[in-house]
């Protein structure tokens, strides 16, 4: 079996079929010449298909063990297309600490179409079992989750969902296929914000989806073409180029994050650290079972919640910005940034405190990052 280190470089369509170019070219075209009336070639119109996008779609399917991949103009565009599989009256079980943008899409947009949902703590499998209704069609979650780094048991949740004839939809953005393989653990559909680790350089907005079901692939393909939120050829090329270095990047992100999490845990200025690589993390054993490393995301709380503003503004290498997964380190406060769309009462109920801080640990020199954090904590 080919190693993922090799697959990220040689997987999917890694060379151009027409010219043999070792980097698939950017086919910057909207339409394609046909052989004659009623005689289209493989591609007709770039909303329906484009060679550069197709190469990326084949690659994500290969990396995740899917039968077909789909590239969208953003992660949320991909989520929207997948959730459009469901109809009025259908019920979706949604992880309670899901990304704010996903929550907003479901709560403010999809409910208008008649879809219903419940937020459930999926780390409690009994709560999950109790949440199923006759109308339940899917369970949707991230693992590790954003921003609380909750680790959910993909195999167990998938098994429970299958017993209720429901699909398992896993957002694998934080782990990437390099660290975690949801389809192999029972998931039906895997989603990514490729803006993050897959692109890896904070220079592209993209979404990727894959499935292990030929039937679902046909439906998702229809929705991708019908909704039309497809990824352009230039952005497709950028994501494919980013994926080529996914292996060394994820190893570096994970190694740096582990040391930084341990540093924060030992600091008197920090009251709590959320990182799956710490042995006292609630999901540590599950993470060890289903991940090959623990990733580059850390969340934590300061002992003095009033010191958050000064802390985040006194860092040199951790840039205050939304998003994550680039080679550079970023810092944000979810309650006022990425998760502001979730009502305050609900945020507090699920544990996203106003003072929670999230780090996207980059691949810079570890000693520089540690010094930066140490000095900022001391300036509080």
Swiss-Prot record:
Its GO biological process terms?
A: cysteine biosynthetic process via cystathionine; methionine biosynthetic process; transsulfuration
> What's the catalysed reaction?
L,L-cystathionine + H2O = L-homocysteine + pyruvate + NH4(+); an S-substituted L-cysteine + H2O = a thiol + pyruvate + NH4(+)
Q: Which InterPro entries match?
A: Cys/Met-Metab_PyrdxlP-dep_enz (IPR000277), Cys_met_metab_PP (IPR054542), PyrdxlP-dep_Trfase (IPR015424), PyrdxlP-dep_Trfase_major (IPR015421), PyrdxlP-dep_Trfase_small (IPR015422)
Kindly give the Pfam families that the UniProt entry links to this protein.
Cys_Met_Meta_PP
**What are the entry keywords?**
Amino-acid biosynthesis, Cytoplasm, Lyase, Methionine biosynthesis, Pyridoxal phosphate
Q: Which coarse location class applies to the principal site listed for this UniProt protein?
A: cytoplasm
Chain positions with N6-(pyridoxal phosphate)lysine modification: 196
* UniProt pathway: Amino-acid biosynthesis; L-methionine biosynthesis via de novo pathway; L-homocysteine from L-cystathionine: step 1/1
Q: Which domain of life is it from?
A: Bacteria
Which Gene3D superfamilies does this entry report, sorted A to Z?
Answer: Aspartate Aminotransferase, domain 1, Type I PLP-dependent aspartate aminotransferase-like (Major domain)
Record GO terms (molecular function) = cystathionine gamma-lyase activity; cystathionine gamma-synthase activity; cysteine-S-conjugate beta-lyase activity; pyridoxal phosphate binding
- One annotated Gene Ontology cellular component of this protein: cytoplasm
Q: Which cofactor does it need?
A: pyridoxal 5'-phosphate
**Family per UniProt?**
Belongs to the trans-sulfuration enzymes family.
Q: What does this protein do?
A: The enzymatic degradation of amino acids in cheese is believed to generate aroma compounds and therefore to be essential for flavor development. Cystathionine beta-lyase (CBL) can convert cystathionine to homocysteine but is also able to catalyze an alpha, gamma elimination. With methionine as a substrate, it produces volatile sulfur compounds which are important for flavor formation in Gouda cheese.
- The name this protein goes by in its record: Cystathionine beta-lyase
- What organism does this protein naturally occur in? Lactococcus lactis subsp. cremoris (Streptococcus cremoris)
Q: What is the lineage of its organism?
A: Bacteria, Bacillati, Bacillota, Bacilli, Lactobacillales
Gene this chain is encoded by: metC
């Amino acid at each position: 079996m080919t190693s993922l280190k090799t697959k990220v470089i040689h997987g999917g369509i890694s060379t151009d079929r027409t010219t043999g170019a070792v980097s698939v070219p950017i086919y910057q075209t909207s339409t394609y010449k046909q052989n004659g009336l009623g005689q289209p070639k493989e591609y007709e119109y770039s909303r329906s298909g484009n060679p550069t996008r197709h190469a990326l779609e084949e690659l994500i399917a290969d990396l995740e063990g899917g039968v077909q991949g789909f590239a969208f103009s953003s992660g949320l565009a991909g989520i929207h297309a997948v959730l459009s599989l469901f109809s009025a009256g259908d019920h979706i079980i949604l992880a309670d600490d899901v990304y704010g943008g996903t929550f907003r899409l479901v709560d403010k947009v999809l409910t208008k179409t008649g879809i219903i949902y419940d937020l459930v703590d999926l780390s409690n499998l009994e709560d999950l079992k109790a949440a199923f209704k006759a109308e339940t069609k899917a369970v949707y979650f991230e693992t590790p989750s954003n921003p609380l780094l909750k680790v959910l048991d993909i195999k167990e949740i998938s098994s429970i969902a299958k017993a209720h004839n429901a699909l398992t939809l896993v957002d694998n953005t934080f782990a990437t296929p390099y660290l975690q393989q949801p389809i192999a653990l029972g998931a039906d559909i895997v989603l990514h914000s490729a803006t993050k680790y897959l692109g890896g350089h904070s220079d592209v907005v993209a979404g990727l989806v894959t499935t292990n079901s030929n039937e679902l692939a046909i439906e998702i393909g229809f929705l991708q073409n019908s909704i039309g939120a497809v990824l352009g050829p230039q952005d497709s090329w950028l994501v494919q180029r980013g994926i080529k270095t996914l292996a060394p990047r994820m190893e570096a992100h994970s190694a740096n994050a582990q040391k930084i999490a341990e540093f924060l845990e030992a600091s008197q200025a920090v009251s709590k650290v959320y990182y799956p690589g710490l042995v006292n993390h609630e999901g540590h054993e599950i993470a060890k079972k289903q991940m090959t490393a623990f990733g580059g995301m850390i969340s934590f709380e300061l002992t003095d919640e009033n010191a958050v503003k000064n802390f985040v503004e006194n860092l040199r290498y951790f840039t205050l910005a939304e998003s994550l997964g680039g080679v550079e380190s970023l810092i944000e406060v979810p309650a006022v940034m990425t998760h502001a769309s979730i009502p305050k009462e609900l945020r507090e109920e699920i544990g996203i405190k106003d003072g929670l801080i999230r780090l996207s640990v980059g691949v810079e020199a570890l000693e520089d990052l540690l010094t930066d954090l140490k000095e900022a904590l001391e300036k509080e």
